[in-house]
Design a protein with these regions (language model features):
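Sequence/fold signature of self-assembling virion shell proteins
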Residues: 3-9, 13-22, 26, 35-38, ...
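Intrinsically disordered or highly flexible coil/loop and linker segments, enriched in small
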Residues: 25, 48-53, 115-119
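Long, acidic, intrinsically disordered low-complexity segments
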Residues: 29-63
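Short helix/loop capping segments that flank catalytic or ligand/cofactor-binding pockets
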Residues: 49-53, 94, 186-189, 277
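Long, hydrophobic/aromatic-enriched structural stretches that serve as scaffold segments
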Residues: 58-104
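Alpha-helical scaffold segments that mediate packing/assembly in large oligomeric complexes
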Residues: 88-163, 286-294
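Extended, solvent-exposed, turn-rich assembly/linker loops in the middle of proteins
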Residues: 128-205
Length: 294
């Protein structure tokens, strides 16, 4: 015997919450919002890394040190968009597809693009590699961060910054690392195994991303380039964003159809235009950690 049953269907009033990818670019980059295409920033260049100290003999002439200004250029020219089209009938009949939801998700996607694009600039940064199980400055050998070496990595990042004369800037802005979840797990394990009150807290609650530990602020990202993680001093890497397009939402009703007519619907459009710069004088203060966990 088999009955035929019609079951009640329940529809939730809201779309399922989107699983957003972490975004850290606002925290680690110096962000400039402008409608200017090209941004020039100057640095001073001399053979003596500023004005060289010379010998002075009383009553004897001396020569000054020549100083030259060097321009670093950031060009805002990389554009991306998120554009979706909906039929007017579908918009009227779907309680889930509304402008707030559409533009909110478009904004998240564009922010995720910026995150990925920032982390893709690793070729401009100073390398840290893993050689024979030891984190090594100015080396591009890839290796995996682990429970045995995560504290060594944190100490090396801070040491390299000091050796590159970035101690005062580190004290002002702070040092950071943007790592994969697998690497952050080892930071969490280290915190749970060391200390007293802090270890108890870490055992009870774990560590939340953007936590300061081992002298660094640790960020988590799922968008690091393969085998690369970003570290160094916060607000050194430059990011330019075109102010006139960022966060703007546009609606285009009745867009052209494939047959030459128009479609009975509306397109929702948002875009972002960006550019990057690793400043010449501070290039050694942004680090490419060659971590295979990424």
């Amino acid at each position: 015997m088999a009955n035929t049953i019609t079951y009640e269907t329940l529809f939730e009033k809201d779309l399922q919450e989107r699983l957003a990818r972490p975004q850290n670019w606002r925290e680690v980059c110096k962000v400039t919002m402008t409608n200017t295409r090209v941004i020039n920033s100057q640095s001073i260049s001399t053979a003596g890394d500023w004005a060289a100290v010379g010998t002075l003999t009383r009553g004897t002439a001396f020569d000054p040190t020549d100083v030259a200004e060097v321009a670093d250029t950031l060009t805002i020219s990389t554009g991306r968009h998120v554009t979706t089209y909906f039929d007017f009938g579908d918009l009227a009949q779907s309680p889930w597809t509304n402008e707030r939801e559409i533009f909110s998700r478009a904004g998240e996607r564009l922010g995720e693009f910026i995150e990925t694009n920032v982390l893709a600039q690793h070729a401009s940064w100073r390398n840290i590699g893993l050689v024979g199980g030891v984190w090594t400055d100015n080396n591009s050998t890839a290796g995996a961060a682990s429970a045995a070496n995560i504290d060594d990595l944190a100490r090396l990042i801070r040491r390299v910054i000091r050796e590159q004369n970035g101690a005062s800037l580190m004290a002002k802005n702070g040092a950071f690392a943007t790592v994969a979840p697998a690497t952050f797990e080892f930071v969490e394990a280290f915190a749970q195994a060391n200390g007293f009150g802090s270890a108890d807290d870490a055992l009870k609650d774990g560590l939340a991303p953007q936590v300061k530990y081992l002298g660094l602020t640790w960020y988590v990202s799922n968008d690091n380039a393969s085998d690369h993680a970003m570290a160094g001093i916060r607000k050194v890497q430059r990011l330019g964003i075109l102010q006139g397009t960022f966060g703007r939402m546009h609606k285009f009703p009745g867009i052209a159809g494939t047959s030459g007519g128009i479609q009975s619907g509306i397109a929702f459009h948002s875009r972002v235009d960006i550019g990057h710069l690793t400043p010449t004088d501070h290039a050694n203060l942004v680090l490419d950690v060659n971590d295979t966990n990424s």
